[in-house]
Every structure is written in C-alpha cells, then in structure tokens.
UniProtKB/Swiss-Prot annotation:
The lineage of its organism: Bacteria, Pseudomonadati, Pseudomonadota, Gammaproteobacteria, Enterobacterales. It is an enzyme of class 3 (hydrolase). Hydrolyzes diadenosine 5',5'''-P1,P4-tetraphosphate to yield ADP. This is Bis(5'-nucleosyl)-tetraphosphatase, symmetrical. It comes from the Bacteria. It comes from Citrobacter koseri (strain ATCC BAA-895 / CDC 4225-83 / SGSC4696). The keyword Hydrolase applies.
Amino acid sequence: MATYLIGDVHGCYDELIALLHQVEFTPGSDTLWLTGDLVARGPGSLEVLRYVKSLGDCVRLVLGNHDLHLLAVFAGISRNKPKDRLTPLLEAPDADELLNWLRRQPLLQVDEEKKLVMAHAGITPQWDLQTAKDCARDVEAVLSSDSYPFFLDAMYGDMPNNWTPELTGLARLRFITNAFTRMRYCFPNGQLDMYSKESPENAPAPLKPWFAIPGPVSEAYSIVFGHWASLEGKGTPEGIYGLDTGCCWGGDLTCLRWEDKRYFVQPSNRHLDSGKGEAVNA
C-alpha cells in the first residue's frame, strides 16, 4: 500500500495514465493524492475528471483555481476561454454529474498519521491547522450548497489580502479561496500579495514565497502543494513539496511516493510554441 502525490494535471490525461502505469498504481490498495487544477489548458479535462471520479475512495484531491473557474463557467458566471479547452467537458452528456461531483471536493486534505497537509496553493503562515480546517469547511459548505453560483460570482478579486478572524461574509470567503488556491507571495507579516508571479529570485522586496515565512502548520506538518509551475519543484524548505512542474506547458507531470520520498516524472506530450507562448501537441 503506497501513497502517490501528483502535481497539477491540467487536462493532461495521457500523461496522468502513463505516470500511474509507471509507478504501478493499484486502485483499491494504493492511495492517490492530487494537488488540484485537474482541468484546463491540456486536451483531456473531460477524461481526467471521469477517471479521477471513477477512483472513488482511493483518491484524495483538493480544488485549484482552475477547477473553481470551471465551476464558474458551468454556472454561467464566467466566460469559456478557448485556450482552456473546456468545451468537450462542458458539452459532455455527463457534465452535470461530473461538475456537481467536483464542486463537492475539498480545499484541504490532512493526514494526521502521516503529519501531511495538502492544499493547491499552500497554507498561509497566518493560519494554524485548526483555522485552516475551519476556513476550508466554510468555503466547502457554500460550494456544496444550492447557493454556490452566488459564491462563485463573488470569489474573484484580490481583496481582502490580510487574515483576521473578524472577516465575515463574502470577504471572508474570498480571502480563504485566494489563500488556498491562488497564493504565491506574502509580505513578512503573512499578508498576501496577489500580483507578483515572478520566480523567487526576481520577486520585489519585501515579498517572500509563502513557504519562506515560518508558520504554525509548516512547523508541525509536511505540506504538499501545486499551483506554482515556475518553481519547477525546487527551492522549498525541508518538508515542503511543490509538485506542479508544468506538464500543460510542455514540462513534466511529477509524482512523489510518500513512503520513500521517491520522485517519478512523466514528460509532457506537448512542447512550448515559443512564438505563441503556448504548449501544443507534440
């Protein structure tokens, strides 16, 4: 019985299946953790959702910002962008079933036995684990309710960017969503910066990657995250694992086997078209 953690799939179905074959993943015996952003950019978002849903209890995933955006498109709130390649999914006969399943997935996974925490973008250093759990449940409850379109319409925006327990209503939900699914950089006090996307060596002072600021969760747990492909899985402190290595951009799909901390990679079937800045089929 092994635990396999895989970075952002982004609709790269063929690479996902090849990677699972490579590690000899056995449903029903092994457990698969996925860092979110299952969909968008790659050609197989529909196939990815169908497959992951079929795995049932042997998969543990978290929602990413692209998954939430898909739900907003599905709800008629956001525009379906051609570059996301979501039309086959949105027009599939089982789209309602798949997307109603997706919106009931969590923002946070915790394994107390392994002392392991997973969230798409990471865990803000302003939170302890109980706060993170409570905040995740706040958003999950709204997403799984009939009023989820109202939340999806209000989730876009960069403010507020500083946590306080006194936050309420949509402002609270927006901060939580940004912290779990969009965060990269923080100010030294843990306040989120939602604008900078540079690599850490080029980030303007005084910004630091969220994982470079000590926090209660990172001091007691290992943290697995995705979201930040330009890190290429490098530069994180001990116990912090960034697994998004840009498969949809022509990079790799990366897997970490938890028990022995061994990495496996599956090269993308796509290459970067430097003229367009987009990955195309190889």
